[in-house]
């Protein structure tokens, strides 16, 4: 099929006016031998999109098309493609579009930790091109970072899995989440909601840990076994002493999380893993020697192997994540940003209606 030489997206024009993006045409990256072009039909709205758009993580080159939970169909394969994907196949792209694929990290399914990592938008490739994301009609990426979407997962539900879902699945699977384990999910936002559903599907006894009881009913509907409202339970670490094998911190900010209370609730050898990337000014404060055989670490995204595992799990277990859809476009992106900033979403947004917004 034919498609335009320039791509078109809903682009952030400045950090100061980040909630009011404009439809913008731009040059795609050069097409290399192992690249794939994808015509986009849905894209999730991730908290990272807001952090980048608003400048929370520093100044970005503008204009910038964000969005890294992309679902669409293959329209072009590079001449040396060996991915097994076909033109017309429905596929997904998450928050990473390049790594060296040659270092020990890449060869051991740790692509997100490669020193040549390129994120789906806002980061320059080695040739200087700054990556552009999925609030657009097309995206061009290396084939390694393109995955097939199982037929029984609708596009609007598949999209949030590609970053948010993977980001919480990776620390769960790497740290033994499963039958006989007690797992805590801190923060019932978009990622925490998926973490709750995924942890239960993996067979763990699952606790949702939040500041108040406001989301208790939703947590129970998602299958949580227990709910802890930390501001209402005092020293909850003492109350739940020696309970958790694993806690995954999904909260967008670390400011209100007391890492000196949480270790009390951990079993010996327990692990606390944060997937949050807070604003630049935030710092983690710990009392010396307070961990007592408990480890605290950070997890970034997840591997392509893990993404395929996650999609298989969601397909086989028929997991239905909680998603609202909005039409892609200047107004739709504005609404998504406004509502996400206010916390007015249950629990992820997916942009749809790409065929109506973009015409080749």
Curated annotation (Swiss-Prot):
It catalyses: a primary alcohol + NADP(+) = an aldehyde + NADPH + H(+); (E)-cinnamyl alcohol + NADP(+) = (E)-cinnamaldehyde + NADPH + H(+); hexan-1-ol + NADP(+) = hexanal + NADPH + H(+); 3-methylbutanol + NADP(+) = 3-methylbutanal + NADPH + H(+). The keyword NADP applies. One of its GO terms (molecular function) is 3-methylbutanal reductase (NADPH) activity. CDD domains: CAD1 (cd05283). Binds 2 Zn(2+) ions per subunit. Transmembrane segments: none annotated. The keyword Zinc applies. Zn(2+) 2 binds at residues 100, 103, 106, 114. GO terms for biological process: alcohol metabolic process; aldehyde metabolic process; furaldehyde metabolic process. NADP(+) binds at residues 47, 51, 188, 190-191, 210-211, 215, 250, 252, 255-256, 275, 277, 298-299, 301, 348. Its EC number is 1.1.1.2, 1.6.-.-. The modification Phosphoserine is found at residues 131, 359. Present with 21700 molecules/cell in log phase SD medium. Homodimer. PANTHER family: ALDEHYDE REDUCTASE. This is NADP-dependent alcohol dehydrogenase 6. It comes from Saccharomyces cerevisiae (strain ATCC 204508 / S288c) (Baker's yeast). The lineage of its organism: Eukaryota, Fungi, Dikarya, Ascomycota, Saccharomycotina.
